[in-house]
Structure formats: C-alpha cells, structure tokens
C-alpha cells in the first residue's frame, strides 16, 4: 500500500496541486503530508472506532435517558470514555507516519535539503536511510551517521509507543479502580 499511495501522490496529487496553486516544485512536503495522511488515517480511524465501540452501550443509553442529545452524549460521555483508545490511535498513527519510507521517498522529492518551507522538496529521516543505505561503505562515517539515524528513529517510535501504553494503562486503571 505504501508504494501505491506514493505513486498516486507522485502522479495525481503532485500534478493537481501544481496546476491549481502554481507551486514551483511538483514534489514537496505538502504532497508528502497528503500521502502520509492517506496512509495514517485508516489506521487511526480503525483503532479509534474500536475504542468507541468498546464503550458500554449502557453509558450511551443512560445519557440519553437523562435527557442529553446525541451530540451531548457523544461529546460528554462516549468520547471521554474512549479517550485512552483514541489517544493511542493518534500516537500509533504518528509513529507510522514517522517511520514511513516509501511515501516520503516518492512524494516529497527526496531532496537532501534542510528547509522549513512546505512547498519545497524535502527528505525524512526514514527516507534518508532508505535512499542512502544501499550505497554506503560499511564501517564508514557515513554508515555511522545512517546507523545513528536508525537508532534515533527507533528511539522516537519506541518512546511514542511507551508513552501511549503508559497513558492508556494509567487511564484504564484509574477508571476501573475508582
């Protein structure tokens, strides 16, 4: 799916955005962001939907029985009850986006530039590793830098997952004990 989304962004989204906005670079950080969102939204939606459907039906019915509207019930009862799961879904989506390689390589222009402009080509950490690891000399300084980037990517992804787990466990324990 990552290659398909990257190719879709490369062919369709990039051309459309350049035609509509007149952005000088066809492949840029905006196109990469759209591609990453296409990859991440289904994951976040699926996990958040599971979290919302895990909320007991009795909470929903009790809120409606007390005179709340459907919107009030959703906002004040269902969403707070499912908040740990929704939070976990968002952080897992961020972790997936952070580690995505193919979409970033195909849709952002994969230019080794350091810029904050979203309309210029860019390169992510994962794309740098994916692009350069095949040509690097083993044991060289370049290899060490790529290895460090891999460790950095692992640490950030692991930290996001650990924070998610700790937060969700804390919220669930608090909810079911008190």
Located regions from the model:
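Cytoplasmic-entry segments and transmembrane alpha-helices of multi-pass inner-membrane transporters
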Residues: 1-9, 46-47, 174-178
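Generic hydrophobic transmembrane alpha-helix motif, especially the helices
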Residues: 1-33
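Hydrophobic alpha-helical segments of membrane proteins
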Residues: 4-12, 86-106, 155-163
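Hydrophobic transmembrane alpha-helices
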Residues: 13, 33-44, 94-98, 108-111, ...
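Alpha-helical membrane-protein architecture signal
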Residues: 27-30, 37, 41, 59, ...
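Transmembrane alpha-helices
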Residues: 45-48, 52-56, 64, 70-106
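C-terminal transmembrane helix and the adjacent membrane-cytosol boundary/short C-terminal tail
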Residues: 49-53, 57-60, 64, 134-178
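Interhelical loop and adjacent transmembrane-helix boundary motif
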Residues: 104-154
């Amino acid at each position: 799916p990552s290659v398909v989304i990257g190719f879709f962004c490369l062919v369709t989204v990039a051309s459309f955005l350049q035609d509509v906005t007149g952005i000088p670079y066809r492949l840029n950080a905006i196109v990469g962001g759209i591609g990453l969102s296409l990859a991440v939204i289904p994951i976040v939606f699926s996990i958040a939907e599971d979290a919302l459907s895990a909320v007991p039906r009795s909470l929903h019915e009790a809120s409606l029985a007390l005179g709340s509207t459907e919107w009030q019930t959703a906002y004040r009862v269902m969403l707070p009850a499912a908040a740990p799961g929704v939070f976990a879904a968002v952080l897992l989506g961020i972790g997936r986006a952070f580690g995505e390689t193919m979409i970033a390589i195909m849709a952002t222009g994969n230019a080794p530039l350091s810029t904050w402009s979203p309309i210029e080509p860019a390169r992510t950490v994962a794309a740098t590793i994916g692009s350069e690891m095949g040509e690097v000399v083993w044991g060289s300084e370049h290899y060490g830098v790529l290895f460090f980037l891999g460790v950095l990517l692992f640490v950030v992804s692991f930290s996001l997952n650990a924070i998610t787990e700790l937060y969700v466990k804390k919220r669930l324990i608090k909810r079911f004990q008190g």
